[in-house]
Amino acid sequence: MEEFKRYLELDRXQQHDFIYPLIFQEYIYALAHDRGLNKSIFFENADYDNKSSLLIVKRLITHLITQMYQQNHFFFYTNDFNPNKFLGYNTNLYSQMIFEGFVVVVEIPFYLRLLSFLEGKDREXLIXLXSLHSIFPFLEDKFSHLNYILDILIPHPVHLEILXQTLRYWVKDPSSLHLLXFFLHEYSNWNSLITPKKYSSSFSKRNQKFFLFLYNFHVCEYESIFVFLRNQSSHLCSISFETFLERILFYKKIELEIFVKDFKAILWVFKDPLLHYVRYRGKSILASKGSSLLMDKWKYYVVNFWECYFYIWAQPRRIHINQLSNNSLDFLGYLSSIRLKPSMVRSQMIENSFLIENASKKFDTLVPITPMIESLSKAKFCNVLGQPMSKPVWGGLSDSDIIERFGRIYRNLSHYYSGSLKKITLYRIKYILRLSCARTLARKHKSTVRSFLKRLGVGLLEEFFTEEEQVFYLTFPKASSTSRKLYQRRIWYLDIFCINDTANHE
């Protein structure tokens, strides 16, 4: 990393190709390999697979560029998906290395910006803010004062070349951009209509880091316009997303006088002191205290912004305007809503007393039962009606492993949905998983569920599935000592960085 810093901190005016030469450095692929093993960013360990060869990677890049100019495409272009050979080596293996190495190289400038942003800040607090549950206290604090939300599904680019064009604003390196364009061109050829879908799925799975980086960067470009408008507002001063506003150009070359004239009108329309934006993956929420007319203007602006500056067919039906008082918000697996909580206040004036009825807004979160049943049904724990089923694919495991898997799934779900006060959905999920576990064990031992539980003892499964309540107590020692009262509390954890999917526990 220090070598990257010394290279990238040179005078930018002297760097004609400040990224492209790094692709030919051997430690880049060592970092890419270590990152694939450790699931982390920029490890110092330089050991990597002996099957990888820097010389082959260099020759393959040169050969790819030569083929690009000769218009003789061979990269990932087979019908039977047999590995192509280049100098006796597997081109699919080394092309994947180039993809991973390219991602590491392009991420370096952004990583250095992140390090400079973190200087002097509490990193532990910033890491805790990355938890999915950290969003809900923010919603609970802000949304009770708002009226309308825009429920937005972020569209995907029409063509992969748009991703490369968006990257031009950050990466001033023609050679690297040409190489990226060639990768995307070969992918689009290989992923044509006549190519079976399973091949493209395999390709995208093997290069998830590459396309995930491009997609995340593309989404950040969407979001930067909201930050820009927020910073320009006279009512607000944003402290977030500072690194996304340091571009030389703003999306597109526009004549200055026209841009200034139009932009003042935009600021006049959208000058809103209570405008909040939240996103997770491909779904985002834009909330405001304004009227429905203001939200219609926001919807019109977002659609036109996507179509004009990103060349995306932004279907208006992907953006829904909902009133918080009348609609629930389906976000991050919770059904969130604003409900009125009535209260009575007795007022005394001299000899007369009377009651005043008052209603306050309260942010409420529920666990939706239908998506949970669908997820369990997809994972073969129950049928579509929620009736528990055995899991025969786990029949070859030991009894302790089977019980541990079922218990871990329930504890993960209970841990994630601890923010809901009404636990009736979790009680039903617990019933489905316990009975599915019992049926799996009974089928393995060729017995009935009743006789197996009688021999095993119901208390064993009950104790294993209620282990998560002890975790709650240890995590929050100031809470009530009774597990029942503790289980009814709303708890938001700061260690959840992804949604646990029961279908992935195969």
UniProtKB/Swiss-Prot annotation:
Keywords, comma-separated and alphabetical: Chloroplast, mRNA processing, Plastid, RNA-binding, tRNA processing
Stated family: Belongs to the intron maturase 2 family. MatK subfamily.
Pfam families noted in UniProt: Intron_maturas2, MatK_N
GO terms for cellular component: chloroplast
Domain of life of the organism encoding this protein: Eukaryota
Function: Usually encoded in the trnK tRNA gene intron. Probably assists in splicing its own and other chloroplast group II introns.
GO BP of this protein: mRNA processing; RNA splicing; tRNA processing
PANTHER family in the cross-refs: MATURASE K (PTHR34811:SF1)
Transmembrane segments: none
Record's signal peptide: none
Protein name: Maturase K
Database matches in InterPro entries: Domain_X, Maturase_MatK, Maturase_MatK_N
Molecular function, one GO term: RNA binding
Subcellular location: Plastid, Chloroplast
